[in-house]
Regions:
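Transmembrane helix-loop junction
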Residues: 13, 83, 96, 127-131, ...
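Transmembrane alpha-helical segments in integral membrane proteins
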Residues: 70-85, 300-322
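Secretory targeting signals
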Residues: 33-40, 47-72, 110-172, 176-179, ...
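Pore- or pathway-lining transmembrane helices of multi-pass membrane proteins that form conduits
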Residues: 21-25, 170-188, 200-207
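Hydrophobic/aromatic residues in alpha-helical transmembrane segments
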Residues: 73-77, 125, 159, 175, ...
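Terminal transmembrane helical anchor/hairpin motif
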Residues: 41-44, 186-299, 304-307, 311
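Helix-loop-helix units of permease transmembrane domains in multi-pass membrane transporters
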Residues: 77-113
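Aromatic- and glycine-rich beta-strand/loop motifs that create alpha-glucan
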Residues: 1-27
């Protein structure tokens, strides 16, 4: 096993590159600007000092992480292998006692380090700003947010490097990576809903079976899996996990919402008066959320992308005649 040699070389090369320092500045700017706003203005304060950090994470930081962090992660990983293939240095690397599997694993681990180190630094600097602000700083909540955000970023890096190993050059790699980014950011939920509509219209799959399929497909989206885990962590009480899954559905009539709550998420669906008429709310019940929709399952689906991407990349990379 020599993948660790490849990983160390990848990271050392990045330390000598200006790219790592640019990444550090980008990460820091993304996170410190909202924290600075909380320090000097009233961003996050209107909900109260006690819940200000939750509001800042839920409405600002989660959007920053899911929209901008994948772009930075893709920038860090899209040319990891394809660039060396084009330049010919990959042949030299493989002439050493490294297998193609070692190269894939080493490149993934090395680029994860390239992204993880500046991201960790950005979280530390950002924490100092938040501590100095008028918000009530909650170390446990912030550390949880930082850790899951790093996991999400590293998953995207692993996918980016894997795509780089599966294609012939960096142009194809950036096209593949940007297609992946656009899909998980803008279109995945639309596709999941369309599949649910198709199951109902053409196969007669309706009710709980239909909504279970749609929710499962949505959770397979790494961006959505990360976001719903964080929404669960930000919620209060034992019903937070259920409400985090429930809020993944918007619209629909009260009957559909009741089915999602009671028959899919094992909750207690109750109608309450609302501004536009009665609406269905999903309250706590004696049953817990089904295991395959739990936070642990969502985390498993998120990490599954690493193995899936690496397997596809290794199979494709192994077929190429360098």
């Amino acid at each position: 096993m020599s993948w660790d040699v490849v990983a160390r070389k990848e990271f050392r090369d990045a330390l000598r590159s200006k790219g790592l320092w640019v990444l550090s500045l980008v990460f820091t700017a993304f996170f410190v600007i909202p924290a600075g706003a909380a320090l000097w203005w009233d961003v996050g304060i209107r909900g109260g000092q006690e819940v200000g950090l939750q509001l800042l994470i839920e409405y600002i930081y989660l959007n920053i992480v899911t929209l901008f962090l994948p772009l930075v992660a893709i920038f860090a990983g899209y040319a990891a292998i394809s660039k060396e293939r084009t330049s010919g240095s990959l042949k030299l690397l493989l002439s050493l006692p490294h297998s193609r599997k070692d190269v894939i694993i080493g490149k993934v681990v090395g680029r994860c380090g390239v992204v993880g180190v500046p991201l960790a630094g950005a979280f530390i600097v950002n924490a100092l700003f938040l501590i100095a602000s008028r918000l009530t700083f909650k170390p446990g909540l912030y550390v949880t947010f930082a850790l899951f955000s790093m996991v999400f970023a590293l998953v995207i890096v692993a996918v980016a490097v894997s795509i780089s190993g599966a294609v012939e050059n960096s142009l194809y790699s950036i096209i593949g990576n940007m297609t992946f980014f656009v899909s998980i950011t803008f279109f995945w939920n639309l596709w999941a809903n369309s599949i649910g509509d198709g199951l109902g219209e053409y196969l007669g799959v309706t009710g709980a079976a239909n909504w279970t399929t749609v929710l499962f497909l949505k959770l397979l989206n790494p961006s959505q899996a990360y976001k719903t885990i964080m929404n669960s962590m930000l919620g209060d009480g034992s019903n937070a996990e259920r409400l985090a899954r429930y809020r993944m559905f918007s619209g629909g009539n009260n009957s559909e919402q009741a089915t999602i709550c009671s028959d899919v998420l094992a909750g207690n669906a109750t109608e309450v008066p609302g501004f536009m008429g009665n609406r269905t709310v999903c309250q706590e019940s004696a049953q817990s959320v089904p295991l395959y929709f739990s936070d642990g399952a969502a985390l498993f689906y998120l990490l599954l992308w690493i193995g899936l991407a690496a397997a596809v990349s290794y199979y494709t990379f192994n077929q190429y005649d360098l």
